From Swiss-Prot:
Pathway: Amino-acid biosynthesis; L-histidine biosynthesis; L-histidine from 5-phospho-alpha-D-ribose 1-diphosphate: step 5/9. Pfam families: GATase. Heterodimer of HisH and HisF. GO terms for molecular function: glutaminase activity; imidazoleglycerol-phosphate synthase activity; lyase activity. The active site is at C85, H194, E196. This is Imidazole glycerol phosphate synthase subunit HisH. One of its GO terms (cellular component) is cytoplasm. It comes from the Bacteria. IGPS catalyzes the conversion of PRFAR and glutamine to IGP, AICAR and glutamate. The HisH subunit catalyzes the hydrolysis of glutamine to glutamate and ammonia as part of the synthesis of IGP and AICAR. The resulting ammonia molecule is channeled to the active site of HisF. It comes from Neisseria meningitidis serogroup A / serotype 4A (strain DSM 15465 / Z2491). Keywords: Amino-acid biosynthesis, Cytoplasm, Glutamine amidotransferase, Histidine biosynthesis, Hydrolase, Lyase. Its main location: cytoplasm.
Amino acid sequence: MQTAIIDYGMGNLHSVLKSVRTAGQLAGKNVEIFLSGDPERVSRADKVIFPGQGAMPDCMAALTRGGLDEAVKDALKNKPFFGICVGAQLLFDHSEEGNTDGLGWFGGKVRRFERDLLDPQGCRLKVPHMGWNTVRQTQNHPLFQGIPQDTRFYFVHSYYFAPENPETILGESDYPSPFACIVGKDNVFATQFHTEKSHDAGLTMLKNFLNW
């Protein structure tokens, strides 16, 4: 089995690669895990992981420039697919960041957290939302196996998903209001948080993906 981590020059790729390889060992899978910016090699993979880090306009431009946008669209149709952070945001119709169109797999927009956010005690919250936060699983999913409700994951983001269809929301967090942080549809699963930075919980989720 081959799992491709898409390399379009935008993301914490070697950290993702290391985490996915560790997850493969935990899963006991004989799986080849590799970075690739080659659309043909991505198209031959059995599973695809789509990380991303940085500004969405830059990520979308890099993806298109490398000819990987069509490979991603094809993978979304028929392969187990995991989007991470900006890689997840790129799956939506549109982002407020740079007024950027995405790939349109999920209906909805990516919105910026408002300025002057306050926590329940009236203290100012910083944007970007950075650090550990609990995640509520709002639906059952195979990738949640072995992960308790309200497990903490690691976030770094100024923008968040606003899906059109609430049935695609699989998990939520609060900052300070609830926002979608996991979405899924058919063969596609995507998280706003960084699984590769989320220690045991992130490794378990990646292991579940390799077993999916």
